[in-house]
Amino acid sequence: MSDAVQQHDVFHYNQAAWDRQARADCEWSRPVDAAEIAEARQGRVLARLTPGPLPAGWLDDARGLDILCLASGGGQQAPLLAAAGARVTVLDASAEQLAHDRVVAEREGLELKLEQGDMRDLSRFADASFDCVFHPISNLYVPDVAPVWRECFRALRPGGRLLASFYNPAAFVADRDPALMEQGLIRPRFSIPYADPAHLSEAELEAKRERGEALVFGHSLTELIGGQAAAGFLIAGFHEDWQPRPRFLIDRYLPAFIATWALKPA
């Protein structure tokens, strides 16, 4: 790991990276517009776990629910859920991502509770505080996902649901050399579980730092799905989705995203 990364723990390093991405108007940092909020006010749940819509039956009605949007700032999912009638709390590491939520809430007259913190530590919330945890693609920014699942289970009420999404681990296996993509070649280079600090060279880590990119961790299916079961959840739904704008060649051949609906037994 580069000296620049060693001087900070992963949380603070990625926190700063996401502040930069939010200011740069990345895909997950573009606040929803008034038309989307108006549609959500009709009771439609438009929040997304993956690029496509939520599968039918996963969260058809949000009215009156206490929902935690976990590591889900950016002015998108939380305002849409609040407009659909939920009481929404957002916890995110990035102040800039939370600022986007605040902008939409103030613009649309929505009530959001905004909290800055680490997705692995929900100790500020009492046991059984929420009916739903909405956790879109973000646990790749922590080295160990097990604490996330344990904290979600604790913070949910009996019968509550965890709606989570993450990258397909297979997306982390291939060498990302652009020259290989131009040749139509997929060359396995990395093993799973994957970790930027362990798998990238010093030069590659330094290049990521210079680009302002976060460190990522490709967790195994055992950690991502088995970990939810180990925390006490029952898996009620499974969904795969494709990358609409493939960044890597492998994205053209398999769904890049996985989403799960997990239940805390009543």
Residue ranges and their predicted role:
Residues 65-121:
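Class I SAM-dependent methyltransferase SAM/SAH-binding core
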Residues 120-133:
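A short acidic, Gly/Pro-enriched loop at the edge of an enzyme's catalytic core
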Residues 146-161:
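A short glycine-rich, Lys/Arg-flanked "PGG" loop and its adjoining helix->strand segment in the class I
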Residues 161-202:
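Conserved class I S-adenosyl-L-methionine
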Residues 231-233, 248-266:
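Core SAM-dependent methyltransferase catalytic element
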